[in-house]
Every structure is written in structure tokens, then in C-alpha cells.
């Protein structure tokens, strides 16, 4: 049995996600098992553009962006699960969210750890659970759906 981790650096992430600055919210994938789980990180710095207005005196990462980062992690897991190479023909879209809960704020200097798990997939729609943590403490949890859709040309 191998202990080798399946990782993704930023170059590989850029091949799978269409997002670019300032909306690419996954920095590295630490490990994944297709069809099961993916662990990723986002390094949160004071240089993030959203901190200019949210909030200048007490910078806090918007919760919707934590959820978006979690959705990006599920998109990566979906691609890896379906053994699909990225193309200009299809994308995995954020399709739904349930049971989103926020437990604490995320501030500059924090490192967000995302753990997403595939629950089921049927006809191009995947259902996932996700947890975001900082220093082992849960920041956010949610159930996320993403859907594979052809891109019209």
C-alpha cells in the first residue's frame, strides 16, 4: 500500500478551474482521493482586495467567499473523480448550497483548510459536504452541489 499523496500545485489548479485573480480562492491541494475526499488550502493575506471594504478597521473575509472557495474545492474533486481533463467544452458550476453555518471569522494571516467529501453523483450533478477550518477550528460547514454543464459556443 502506498502512502503517496495526490497533490495539486497552483499550475495544475489553474488547468482545472476557470477562475483567475482575484477570484481564484484555492492555493494548493494537499491530498485527494477521487470519488471520496479532497483537502486544500487558501492562504489569507491582508493583500486580498475584499479587505479594503470588508472591513477596513477590522478586516474579515466575507463568508460567501469562504463558501466559494469550498465550491472551487468541490469542482476540483469532481474533475478528478470523473477522470476528466479540463477543456473548453464543459465546466463544473456551483449549483446549490444547504446547511451553511459560520462558526468564527477569518482574518488576514489565517490559513483556511478545506475538507470536501463527495456524497453522491448522478447525471453530472455531485453532492458534497465541506468544512473549512483555521488552526483545526471549524470556521464554516455546508452541503454543496455542483453540476457539469457543456459550454455553448
Swiss-Prot record:
GO molecular function: (3R)-hydroxyacyl-[acyl-carrier-protein] dehydratase activity
SUPFAM superfamilies: Thioesterase/thiol ester dehydrase-isomerase
Protein keywords: Cytoplasm, Lipid A biosynthesis, Lipid biosynthesis, Lipid metabolism, Lyase
Enzyme Commission number(s) from the entry: 4.2.1.59
Top-rank taxon, per record: Bacteria
Cytoplasm among keywords: yes
GO terms (BP aspect): fatty acid biosynthetic process; lipid A biosynthetic process
Active site annotation, chain numbering: 54
UniProt xrefs under Pfam families: FabA
Cell compartment(s), UniProt: Cytoplasm
Chief location category: cytoplasm
HAMAP family: FabZ
Protein name, as recorded: 3-hydroxyacyl-[acyl-carrier-protein] dehydratase FabZ
Name of the encoding gene: fabZ
Amino acid at each position: 500500500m502506498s502512502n503517496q499523496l495526490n497533490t495539486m500545485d497552483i499550475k495544475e489548479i489553474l488547468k482545472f478551474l476557470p477562475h483567475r485573480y482575484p477570484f481564484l480562492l484555492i492555493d494548493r491541494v494537499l491530498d485527494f482521493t477521487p470519488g471520496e475526499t479532497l483537502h486544500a488550502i487558501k492562504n489569507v493575506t491582508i493583500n486580498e482586495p475584499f479587505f479594503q471594504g470588508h472591513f477596513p478597521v477590522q478586516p474579515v473575509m466575507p463568508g460567501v467567499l469562504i463558501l466559494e472557495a469550498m465550491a472551487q474545492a468541490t469542482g476540483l474533486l469532481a474533475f478528478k473523480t470523473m477522470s476528466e481533463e479540463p477543456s473548453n467544452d464543459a465546466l463544473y458550476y456551483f449549483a446549490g448550497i444547504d446547511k451553511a453555518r459560520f462558526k468564527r471569522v477569518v482574518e488576514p494571516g489565517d490559513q483556511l483548510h478545506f475538507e470536501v467529501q463527495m456524497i453522491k453523483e448522478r447525471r453530472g450533478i455531485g453532492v458534497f459536504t465541506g468544512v473549512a477550518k483555521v488552526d483545526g477550528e471549524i470556521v464554516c460547514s455546508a452541503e454543496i452541489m455542483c453540476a457539469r454543464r457543456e459550454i455553448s459556443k
